[in-house]
Amino acid sequence: MAASALQQPSYLLANLKADWTNKPLHQRCHELCKIIDDYPAKELHAIFPWLVECVFGSLDGILTGWNLRFLQARSAEYSIAMEFLDPSGPMMKLVYKLQAEEYKYEFPISYLPGPIKSSIHAGVLPDCPLFHNKIQFPMSGLLFLNPFEYYMFNFASSLIAPKNYPQGQHGSSSDSAYFVLVDTYLKYFLPTEGNVPPSPFSDTRGTVASPAPRSTNVPYVGYGGHSTSLLKRHITHQSSVNADPAAQEIWRSETLLQVFVEMWLHHYSLEMYQKLQSPQVKEPFMPSEEHVLVVRLLVKHLHTFSSSLKPESISSSPSAHSHSSPLEELKRVVVQRFVQQKLYVFLQHCFGHWPLDASFRAVLETWLSYIQPWRYTGDKNNTQTDGPNRTVPDKWASFVQENLLLYTKLFQGFLNRAMRTDLVNAKNALMVFRVAKVFAQPSLSEMIQKGEQLFLEPEHAILQRHNRVFLTPSHGGSFLSARQPMGTDNVFKVKSHVYSLEGQDCQYNLMFGPDQRKNVLKLIQIIAQARQTAKRISDHSTEMAANNSFLSWFGVGSPDHNSTFTGGEMDEMGGEGVKKTHEFLDKALDYLCQIFRLNAGQLSQLISNVASVDNNGASKQLPDCIPSENGLVLTDLGRLQIINGLRRFEIEYQGDPELQPIRSYENAFLVRLLFQISSFINERLGEHMEVLCSRQDFLGSVGRHYLSSSSAVVEQRRKSPVTRQMRDRPQRARLSLRALASYRTLLTLLLLYMLFALLSFGLFSSTGLILIISFLYELLSNFFHEKLKTH
């Protein structure tokens, strides 16, 4: 051992702090490795909380630590950090070294998710066994954790802690060191093959404490009933040593899983979920896209972990269960017992509160990953990627029934989102296509319908079983001991699932019922309308590309800058985007028809109705509005029409055209000078201009062509709503010289003067010719324009 080992722990910590910021990461890690190897646990105990904070950052987000969430593989520090934090690396070696002793570390309750924090403050111990025997009386506001628990709590908290990262740090979340570490820890502590590697140090004190045994005379409280056992009654000073040696095998696995689930998913209790249905309630927590992606990684691995259950352990025979290892037993119950309820409430919140944009794809894929466990079985015969013709094996019918709400209720939630989303956008169209493709898998819709039929079974058969007692965690049991009696039928399981999540008085809306079918038909109409809009945008972009050619720069094209599509439609769509939108929406229509058994006649009728409305020019009308003193006000229907690109306002400048902001293609000095000249002329000759424009002969036509009259403004205002004050404002005929300040006009004049100079024309003769040619050109243009109007 190094000579400095005789120093007091405070000196070791002080020395580390003094040199920490002055050394590069690789040197710090090298020295830490040496310290972990050379020093005993008694001296390492003092530096452990400080080291965890230096790596993961502070819980309040002020200190960012190693920025694992932004540390990308291309960074030089990436491999150093990954090697140090590996499950078999120096940091975990330190954890195990401290775990072999009876050291405890404090974790503030204030940094726990809201429902857990509220429960503890109310004197009710959370259902999760992770928190048993972690709190002391009198209440200190702290959890007392062993080293492994403390490490994992800080690791999980760093994902949701608000951190002020330096600007300019960008990268893919799925390539970050944090994301890769989560995947590494899941594969190490929840292995699909073999067992969890043993700790390198003797450990008899690190096991998860078993909850107090539950009395068998506790009555069953019904579907979804919650235990209100008091905190004082549950806190007993039990030994942390588990009497069963086989359970030593998975204590780290169960701890890691419970920490991840509680810290990442348990942000909304069932009661809070019910309250959040009201828009007046402020949401307590909003996950980030990165947070959701990590949750999806957790869901995918748990499905893979659960599907690796040995065939002999899948048997429902009690004798088979009695011979299962603790890890195999964990695989059996991991999804239903640990994840289902909290993930359902988490996804419900995201479906209801996430912005209506393409970032919802992360939430969507998390949901689709959970409801397709058959994708993660590793079956060689079942490895097609989301193949729509792949039949869902019959063995998954029980999973569908026991997770019915995650199929039906969340599908209805997605349907409501889709009807309010801009489906002209290819990214949003892709999400509709993905959901329709998943639910169109053969036999899946039949399984869902079967589950709904089981839920509708009468209650009398269930009431006969009211004496059954389930040792669930909320009634004092542990996660691994909470198995339902083998005689429980499918009806009971489905009803228990629905009532436990939605409450005894829930009004279940059938996914294949008449109300939902109406919503599906409405979505199909919106999809058809979005296809029409995409086609119109494509045609418009083609037309604008032709008008904005090189020749149009010289004046041949239209100078109207208010006629283009507004917003980001043209930027995001493009030819390829329109093509993808059509492809996604066409396939989504086919899949929806398969799911809800719509025949070709019904589909063609819906699409033809949309096409006929579009051909009648409805798409060129204003959105649905009601008049008011301040102009037109959008209705709910009008908002939906704008969101889906069905109708739009023509956004045009409604003020004085001469006072518009100076454009980049105009000379500022000339704009101001010509405005002064035209204002002087209009003030002196305004009445004569009005008389000229009011004539119905040829001179009146020429006057209206050259002078800006009220008729042109009235024509523009038909396309865009205006206030009553703007509508009542009188418009007078006047001369506008602003077009002469355009650089395009100036360049055209320069080229004409150069041409006439080559033909030996002088300055005054060239000016006269230009005026005559311009007058004749405008005269002919006005003549043909009037002819077209009369026809």
Swiss-Prot record:
The keyword Transit peptide does not apply. Keywords: Cell membrane, Endoplasmic reticulum, Golgi apparatus, Hydrolase, Lipid metabolism, Magnesium, Membrane, Metal-binding, Nucleus, Transmembrane, Transmembrane helix. GO terms for molecular function: metal ion binding; sphingomyelin phosphodiesterase activity; sphingomyelin phosphodiesterase D activity. One of its GO terms (biological process) is cellular response to tumor necrosis factor. The chain crosses the membrane at residues 755-775. Disulfide bonds: none annotated. This is Sphingomyelin phosphodiesterase 4. It is an enzyme of class 3 (hydrolase). Its cofactor is Mg(2+). It is a single-pass membrane protein. It comes from Danio rerio. Pfam families: mit_SMPDase. It catalyses: a sphingomyelin + H2O = phosphocholine + an N-acylsphing-4-enine + H(+). Catalyzes the hydrolysis of membrane sphingomyelin to form phosphorylcholine and ceramide. It has a relevant role in the homeostasis of membrane sphingolipids, thereby influencing membrane integrity, and endoplasmic reticulum organization and function. May sensitize cells to DNA damage-induced apoptosis. Its main location: endoplasmic reticulum. One of its GO terms (cellular component) is Golgi membrane. Its EC number is 3.1.4.12.
